From Swiss-Prot:
This is Probable nicotinate-nucleotide adenylyltransferase. The lineage of its organism: Bacteria, Pseudomonadati, Pseudomonadota, Gammaproteobacteria, Enterobacterales. Pfam families: CTP_transf_like. Catalyzes the reversible adenylation of nicotinate mononucleotide (NaMN) to nicotinic acid adenine dinucleotide (NaAD). One of its GO terms (molecular function) is ATP binding. GO terms for biological process: NAD biosynthetic process. It catalyses: nicotinate beta-D-ribonucleotide + ATP + H(+) = deamido-NAD(+) + diphosphate. The keyword GTP-binding does not apply. Keywords: ATP-binding, NAD, Nucleotide-binding, Nucleotidyltransferase, Pyridine nucleotide biosynthesis, Transferase. Pathway: Cofactor biosynthesis; NAD(+) biosynthesis; deamido-NAD(+) from nicotinate D-ribonucleotide: step 1/1. InterPro entries: Cyt_trans-like, NadD/NMNAT, Rossmann-like_a/b/a_fold. The gene is nadD. Its EC number is 2.7.7.18.
Length: 213
């Protein structure tokens, strides 16, 4: 049986413990040996990042240097076009072949807006979705047809993620950390401490570069 590959996308502006810690817990829960982080270049659903792509890449490298679970994929950073998950997953599927189990990790907030994503209906053709639960967010989709879509693909058996190449949605019971990149940027702008929110090498780099001031 081929091992489950997992991808984790985002802006990471900057990367912080709210990104890394839930995914590390998830890896232990469902048996992931490698998670590939894919930073966006031009995110289609949010404003352009404050740190440029080179700076965000370097912060990620610093954050995962002592974490063998994680590896970095730069393909979206090398595009000048918007970073569409559907496109990236199609590329991965073509590279890995039809039989390798592949999953894309998202937060519960992203699940609720998932039907607005570019070619969202093709994503489950190429990968599973693993959703990190977040308190305060409902499990119901906004419209009945999307709720039906969720229920049609939902599984409560994590083994399905390993045995099938794509097509399932799994809601993972991961810890939630009240940390966001927005909070970190605001604290830095106000001269407040962020030592408990992100890895020390990342904070050192932010200060050296004068980011988010």
């Amino acid at each position: 049986m081929k091992s489950l590959q997992a991808l984790f996308g985002g802006t990471f502006d900057p990367v912080h413990y709210g990104h890394l810690n839930p995914v590390e817990t998830l890896a232990n829960l469902i048996g992931l040996t490698r998670v590939t982080i894919i930073p966006n270049n031009v995110p289609p659903h949010r404003p352009q990042p404050e740190a440029n792509s080179v700076q965000r890449k370097h912060m990620l490298e610093l954050a995962i240097a002592d974490k063998p679970l994680f590896t970095l994929d730069e393909r979206e950073l090398k595009r000048n076009a918007p970073s569409y998950t559907a496109q990236t997953l199609k590329e991965w599927r073509q590279e890995q072949g039809p039989d390798v189990p592949l999953a894309f990790i998202i937060g519960q907030d992203s699940l609720l807006t998932f039907p607005t994503w570019y070619e969202y209906e093709t994503i489950l053709d190429n990968a599973h979705l693993i959703v990190c639960r977040r308190p305060g967010y409902p499990l119901e989709m906004a419209q009945p047809q999307y709720q039906q879509w969720l229920e049609d693909h939902l599984t409560h058996n994590q083994e399905d993620l390993h045995l099938q190449p794509a097509g399932k949605i799994y809601l993972a019971e991961t810890p939630w950390f009240n940390i966001s990149a927005t909070i970190i940027r605001e604290r830095l702008q106000n001269g407040e401490s962020c030592e408990d929110l992100l890895p020390e090498p990342v904070l050192t780099y932010i200060n050296q570069q004068g980011l988010y001031r």
